[in-house]
C-alpha cells in the first residue's frame, strides 16, 4: 500500500496551535458535527506536536513525514469518538505513540529478517540534523542509544524526558497504570544515562554545552 502524505499546510507556513481550552472545545464541536475544515484545523494545530513526537522517538529520517500522515489519517477516522475537549490532545498523542511503537517493532523485525536470511542490511535512512557537526554527531549517537530501548520503554522515555509529561499523563497516553509508567520511565532513564556516561562523544558534548550555558 502506497504511503499517503498530507499537504494541508505548506512547509513554510506558520502553524496555528490551539492556545486555550476554549479552542479545543470549539474544535471538538467541529469534529462531532462534522463541520467542513475540521481536519485541516486539526492538522495545523497539532502537526508540530505529532511531528516532534515521531522525530524524538525515531530520530530524523526520511520516513517521518509518512508516519505523521499515518497518525493524522487514523485521527481523522476515529476522532468522532472523543467526548471531552480536554481529551483531544491526549487522544492524538496516544495514536502517535502507538504508531511509533508499531514502527519500532517493524524495524526490529526487518533487521532480524536481514540477519537470519544473510541478505544485505537495510539501507540506513537519511538523517537530517543540525548544522553544527558536533551537535549532529551527538544526535546520531543519542538516537542509537534510544534505538536500543524496547518500544514501550522508548515511548515512556520520549514522553517523560523529551515532552515533559508527568507519570499520570504518560499512563493515560500509553494506557497503563501509574506504577507501570513509573517503572518504564525509570528503566529507560537508567539505560540512557548509563550508555551516555560510557559514550565519550556524548559526554564531552554535554559537558561543553553545560559550560557554555553556565558561562
Task: Give the role of each language-model region.
Residues 32-33, 56-60, 69-87, 106-108:
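Sigma70-family region 2
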Residues 2-11, 112, 172-173, 189-215:
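C-terminal edge and immediately downstream basic/flexible tail or linker adjoining helix-turn-helix-like DNA-binding
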Residues 12, 21-24, 110-135, 139, ...:
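Internal acidic/polar
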Residues 33-36, 125-158, 163-173:
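Amphipathic alpha-helical segment used for protein-protein interaction
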Residues 43-61, 77-78, 146, 198:
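Amphipathic, Lys/Arg- and hydrophobic-enriched alpha-helical face
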Residues 77-84, 94-115, 135:
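Arg/Lys-rich amphipathic alpha helix in sigma70-family domain 2
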Residues 97-101, 153, 162, 167-168, ...:
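DNA-recognition helix of helix-turn-helix
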Residues 22, 29-52:
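A short, charge-rich alpha-helical start-of-domain segment used by transcription regulators
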